[in-house]
Regions:
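Gly/Pro/Ser/Thr-rich low-complexity, intrinsically disordered segments predominantly at protein N-termini
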Residues: 1-201
Length: 201
């Protein structure tokens, strides 16, 4: 049996609930009703379940840094590892989101609507590279999400690629490549020291 885990196809024994899937295939709302033994973090891309791979130290530190350093205005909230429902068979789980405070309607919220998302951040790993660089940006831009950051590891340090939506064609245009320091504007000014060493010193 073939499973997709972290973007790689692997021969593995899948649990009964995951294969062949429900009649008609997986839909976004079904992720809220997976059995207790299912992984905590699962994405739905084009109707396929993606089991997210184990977290690296780089990704953990990068998410911690952004959670700590992003200082959005009062009408926006930083959310970590929450999904966004883009369509019937599309429910990716970005690493970081900035969402409207009004979207936090309940502590039971498990997913956001694209119109409530201001910024998406994806931290690239070897397993997720193709999805993070190609597949997901197209889906995010088609959904009208205005800002996207893609973070890569380069020589043990982060590089942040920033993008803004060109609304007429629903495509992202690059606005910068940031090393050592992230300075950009996403409706408010962002200035973040990208030195991860200060988080563990």
């Amino acid at each position: 049996m073939i499973a997709e885990v972290g973007g790689n196809q692997m021969s593995t024994a899948l649990p009964d609930w995951s294969y062949p899937g429900p009649p008609g295939g997986w839909t976004a709302d079904m992720l809220d009703h997976l059995p207790p033994g299912a992984p905590r973090h699962v994405e739905l891309i084009d109707g396929s379940l993606i089991m997210l791979s184990p977290q690296s130290a780089f990704r953990m530190l990068m998410l911690r840094l952004l959670e700590r350093e992003l200082d959005p205005p009062d009408d926006l909230v930083v959310a970590r590892q929450m999904s966004v429902t883009l369509g019937l068979r599309q429910r990716p789980e970005p690493d970081i989101l900035l969402v409207k405070r009004t979207a936090m309607t309940s502590l039971a919220t498990t997913s956001f609507r694209p119109e409530d998302v201001h910024l998406i951040v994806e931290v690239v790993s070897p397993e997720s590279a193709e999805r993070d660089r190609t597949t997901k940006p197209i889906k995010y831009s088609n959904a009208g999400i205005r800002f996207l950051w893609r973070i890569e590891q380069e020589d043990e340090a982060p590089v942040v690629y920033t993008f803004e939506l060109e609304p007429a064609v629903r495509a992202y245009v690059p606005t910068g490549i940031h090393r050592k320091r992230l300075r950009t504007s996403i409706g408010f000014e962002v200035d973040v020291d990208l030195d991860l060493g200060r988080l563990i010193s």
